[in-house]
Amino acid sequence: MTEFDLSTREGRWKHFGSVDPIEGTKPTTKNEMTDLQSTHKDFLFEIEEVGIKNLVYPVLVDQYQTAGTFSFSTSLTKDEKGINMSRIIESVEKHYDNGIELEFNTLYQVLCTLQTNMKQNAAGVDVSGKWFFDRYSPTTNIKAVGNADVTYGLAIDGDKVTRKELTIEATVTTLCPCSKEISEYSAHNQRGVVTVKTYINKDQDIVDDYKNKILDAMEANASSILYPILKRPDEKRVTERAYENPRFVEDLIRLIAADLVEFDWLEGFDIECRNEESIHQHDAFAKLKYRK
């Protein structure tokens, strides 16, 4: 058995099984290597979407930098074997500047670059990240940072936008109307997780504060908003407001829908509320879909 010098890194590597590289016969320069993806012949079917998922990149949501998780795709004609996936990252890098701004205009520019680099007609992106924003306590007006989850979806075909979506997930307080009605005092309440997926008009300019308008519809219709910081006067106000505004999951999604239906820049929406029930071992939920 060969003995290696364990005082060196190379010796330890070989001791654990590493071997020296062999003298190969295949090309080592890019121009000489076979490019299988670029093979052209009849591959039977065109592909609607092919690309990469779970690409994590820095993004900017308003004034805060956070991590975005991306899914990028392009179309592929039936006479092409595959796409060059490294060009997807190259397309992203062309628009990177201490983070990619999570706005539809920026994502549209990224997709246009992707179209050009991939030489395909269609391209799409979905990206999720944390949205951080200033939140003030209701009575003492102390500022802290709140958050919600956002997911942008955008797709283009040629110069036409074919899909434009925004999903927001936020947490609220819901107080049970039945518990309040039947009890001499108090009522059980819990944290509710509200998810709103909006389908945005592709041919109309969107309002500047669209995220805040959607979030307001989600939170204002709940029994209470959640706050990062609450002093005693704030906690009193939050508790009393929840008692004044009891909500079933059914109530909440209907009230949110009543606000969203008034936004002329929306073509439709899906709403789900899931209550993490404080007196049960199960959750309660309700879903609603609406198209104009």
Swiss-Prot record:
A Pfam family the protein falls into: GCHY-1
Top-level division of the source organism's lineage: Bacteria
One function term, GO molecular function aspect: GTP cyclohydrolase I activity
Gene3D superfamilies attached to this UniProt entry: Urate Oxidase (3.10.270.10)
Pathway per the UniProt entry: Cofactor biosynthesis; 7,8-dihydroneopterin triphosphate biosynthesis; 7,8-dihydroneopterin triphosphate from GTP: step 1/1
Signal sequence extent: none
GO biological process: tetrahydrofolate biosynthetic process
Keywords, in A-Z order: Hydrolase
Enzyme Commission code: 3.5.4.16
Coiled-coil zones: none
The reaction(s) this protein catalyses: GTP + H2O = 7,8-dihydroneopterin 3'-triphosphate + formate + H(+)
InterPro entries the UniProt entry points to: GTP_cyclohydrolase_FolE2, GTP_cyclohydrolase_FolE2/MptA
UniProt keyword Hydrolase, yes or no: yes
Function (record text): Converts GTP to 7,8-dihydroneopterin triphosphate.
UniProt similarity note: Belongs to the GTP cyclohydrolase IV family.
NCBIfam families: PRK13674.1-1
Protein name, UniProt field: GTP cyclohydrolase FolE2
Organism: Staphylococcus aureus (strain MRSA252)
Gene: folE2
